[in-house]
Amino acid sequence: MMVFWIGLNILVTEALRTLLGTDVPAWAVLLASSGPLYVVAMPLSMLAFTRVPVIRTRQYPMKAGEFIQIFVMCIPVMFLGNMIGNILSAGATDGQATNRINDVILGSDWRVNALFIGLLAPVCEEWIFRKEIISRLRRYGEKTAIIFSALAFALFHMNVFQFFYAFGLGLMFGYVYTRTSRLRYSVAMHMLINLNGSVLAPLVIQQIDPRILDGTVSEAEIMRMAEAGNMGDMGIMMLYGTVMLGLCIAGIVLLITKRKSWEFYLAPEELPAGLKIRTAYANPGVIAYLLLTVMLTGWMLFA
């Protein structure tokens, strides 16, 4: 899947540059990346998946309160992972690395972001990394399947900035899918998080004077703006930040208080502890995937 996706991505991107020169619109960049992935690479991956049988499980509904609680738990997981990714990226490159995904998001129309990042990506990614992977690996152990799914999901992004929060969220989404066997819940959580990061947050940032964000406005000028009542847009950002901080704190509290309520059940073909890593990861296909994605992650960081 990765080879087809990357190869087609390069071909489509080069074709766009040939036609449009260096002035390639952001929506075209997203299309060049997402189109080959969703239309060609992911369907082709089924050729490999179908070789491993799916274990049939009962489906369980998730109550609204349970959904909200787990979604709120995702917020601190996301923030912590994002901090780790930013710190490691900056440390490895002496602060020279840039998050290309953020650049694409900020340079795109919010409707394009909503379609490709907020809607299509969660559906396709949850289908592959939760439904197809966990449904086939859970026979060997629920924790093994969830961790494998989360790691594959994180490496799939090929971005140190995103790796840690994608891994953390992958664990959360994997647990939700394992307990319910219904894709709708993890897809909905994934959509909410992506819509926040690709639509809501950029719209909030765009309301702020860029000089305030980059620190080129003096304190005296900020005071004059406040006295003149011109800080309304800043108030929106402060409100957004306050809400996210509140959700983050609530999520931490829930993660602590609910830590003993996570349920995992013995699988029909549960692997012994000493064989789990060897069986799940020490095979040619997984090794090739790990090597390819790790190399591309490093290349994306230093390129």
Positions of predicted regions on the chain:
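Generic hydrophobic, helix-prone segments enriched in Leu/Val/Ile
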Residues: 1-2, 28-32, 53-54, 71, ...
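Juxtamembrane helix-loop-helix connectors linking adjacent transmembrane helices
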Residues: 19-28, 54-127, 135, 298-303
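Membrane-helix interface segments in multi-pass membrane proteins
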Residues: 6-37, 82-109, 161, 202-242, ...
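Alpha-helical transmembrane segments of polytopic integral membrane proteins
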Residues: 8-9, 13, 41-46, 77, ...
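Transmembrane helix-loop-helix hairpins at the membrane interface
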Residues: 111-302
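Alpha-helical transmembrane segments
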Residues: 1-9, 69-78, 285-294
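Membrane-helix interface linkers and caps
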Residues: 14-22, 26-72, 96, 249-273
